[in-house]
Amino acid sequence: MALVNEHFLKLPGSYLFSDIAKKVNTFKITHPKQDIIRLGIGDVPQPLPQACIEAMHKAVEELASKDTFRGYGPEQGYDFLRNAIVDYYKRNGVDCIEPDEVFVSDGAKSDTGNITDLFAQDNVILIPDPVYPVYVDTNIMNGRNITYIDANAENNFLPMPDHNFHADVIYICSPNNPT
């Protein structure tokens, strides 16, 4: 018989961004003439650049033909993309990255959530509060030992742990992490 992960029951009752969406919708109903600047999850401020649109069209055409169809890419990402990433950084003054050090993934959310899978179960995880919810939720689900440190106006939202405190993994969160 399959059993539920006991740590699942320790998660908050709802997801932060769902709660925010409900509050925004309620605000819009009660204040219909008020403008809202949305800075939340999944919102982008500008349309895609033309170069991205052209590359996506080309990729769709390649996927539509038996001669150019590729299926899943290499697990580390296509060489042309990894080389382009390295070239971008070199053009911008960062000349210490090699293509074999570049990992192309399905997105920051899953990677930042799963990174602690590389570490021992009993490591102490230090997480600022507030933080991007996936950092907390994935560590709770894995039964990790989490310690929180307050990020607030008094410390400029840049908390520093006490020098006597021990942590094995420390999440650093800025207002724009993980994007």
Regions found by a protein language model. Give the residues of each.
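Conserved core of the PLP fold type I
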Residues: D67-T179
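N-terminal small-domain helix-loop-helix segment of the aminotransferase-like
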Residues: L3, K10-D106
